[in-house]
Amino acid sequence: MTQPDMSQILAQAQQMQAQLQAAQQEILASSVVGDAANGLVTVTMSGSGEVTAVNIDPKVVDPEDVETLQDLVQGAFLDAHKKVADLAQEKMGPLSQGFGGDMGSLF
């Protein structure tokens, strides 16, 4: 059995590292919008998980029912967070298979 060429292995590792860095940058440059109540409440989140905007349609603002509004904001946030995780899995998943792991769990 022949020995693997170390320079070839190193070159492949460097190429994979560059691909991972590019995917990470793409994720960080992205933003997603999570929503609740068919878009009446939306949360915009960056790829790093930072909430950059919250929009609430006045139709869902009822001073007598603050709990529903709180639930909708929480639901929109969770939806946005899931979309960031899905984006990370989409971008990093194929690359992480080379490492035998699930990189999506990092986000």
From Swiss-Prot:
InterPro entries: YbaB-like_sf, YbaB/EbfC. GO terms for molecular function: DNA binding. Its main location: cytoplasm. It is found in: Cytoplasm, Nucleoid. Keywords: Cytoplasm, DNA-binding. It comes from the Bacteria. GO terms for cellular component: bacterial nucleoid; cytosol. Belongs to the YbaB/EbfC family. HAMAP family: DNA_YbaB_EbfC. Binds to DNA and alters its conformation. May be involved in regulation of gene expression, nucleoid organization and DNA protection. PANTHER family: NUCLEOID-ASSOCIATED PROTEIN YBAB. NCBIfam families: DNA_YbaB_EbfC (TIGR00103). Homodimer. This is Nucleoid-associated protein CE0210. The lineage of its organism: Bacteria, Bacillati, Actinomycetota, Actinomycetes, Mycobacteriales.
